């Protein structure tokens, strides 16, 4: 069975709820999921995971200078090299994500090979578009194994 590590940084709980919804979706597709806060995530959590989800709420001005919050940035610096994992970035936001994903990737530079999927939502649940995107990602992962 494939497995996923879902890491998250949440300010008011919205990103945590989004992470839980992603985990439920993965579990419904027979992928075991573990959700771990960036405050609690350690190197051993990455072992055995086929895919790693990195989630953070969008910090910054309403429509400019979007970026991950400092706690997530510090976590990214300590993340081990995980070039053998499929990577998904996700964020919750109020108005726009702007440069959020670009900034997240910058902080993971040298730790990951590529980002396979980027998910975003204004709500603490996956949208129908998110579900279709994740479904396509899972299909591509299963075809390559």
Task: Go through the PLM ranges and name each one.
Residues 1-26:
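N-terminal beta1-alpha1 ligand-phosphate binding loop
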